[in-house]
A protein has these predicted regions:
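Conserved short strand/loop->alpha-helix "switch" segment adjacent to the catalytic nucleotide/phosphoryl-transfer site
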Residues: 3-22
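Conserved ATP-binding N-box helix of the HATPase_c
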Residues: 16-40, 97
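Short beta-strand/loop element within the Bergerat-fold HATPase_c
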Residues: 41-53
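Glycine-rich/acidic phosphate-handling loop/turn and adjacent ATP-lid/helix
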Residues: 53-86
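C-terminal beta-strand of the catalytic ATP-binding
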Residues: 61, 119-123
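Glycine-rich phosphate-binding loop
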Residues: 84-98
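Glycine-rich ATP-binding loops of the HATPase_c
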Residues: 102-112
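Glycine-rich nucleotide-binding loop
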Residues: 111-119
Length: 123
């Protein structure tokens, strides 16, 4: 795991609880996905973008399910996990609810050949 933090957390315009909830879900998902891969990679960047005055938290991980539909992962009940499905499919949906309550937050999800990426922007 690689981690880089270059940000003062005192000026974030989000409650500590909501930020921890988002990060906990994203990190749990990244760890679960990377565990399933032969090459287990998790990259975390925390930094400030001074050009447009935003904070960025980027979490990237290797993933196995290349057919993953990133348009559906935020739907309530959608899960890539096959066991105990009633316990899964709520994490990213909860993030979506937090994003809707906070107009200063954006989350961009992308996938490439090797890495799945979640970029949280805080304005």
């Amino acid at each position: 795991m690689n981690m880089e933090i270059m940000l003062d957390f005192n000026d974030l315009n989000i409650s500590t609880y909501e930020l921890c909830r988002i990060l906990g879900i994203l990190l749990d998902n990244a760890i679960e996905a990377a565990k399933m891969c032969e090459e287990k990679i998790i990259n975390i960047q925390v930094r400030r973008d001074f050009k447009i005055d935003r904070k960025l938290i980027i979490i990237e991980n290797t993933y196995k399910n290349k057919s993953l539909n990133i348009d559906k992962i935020f739907e309530k009940g959608y899960s890539t996990k096959k066991n105990n499905e009633e316990l899964h499919g709520l994490g990213l949906w909860n993030i979506r609810r937090i994003l809707h309550k906070n107009s200063n937050l954006n989350l961009f999800t992308t996938k490439k050949d090797k890495l799945f990426s979640q970029q949280l922007e805080i304005y």
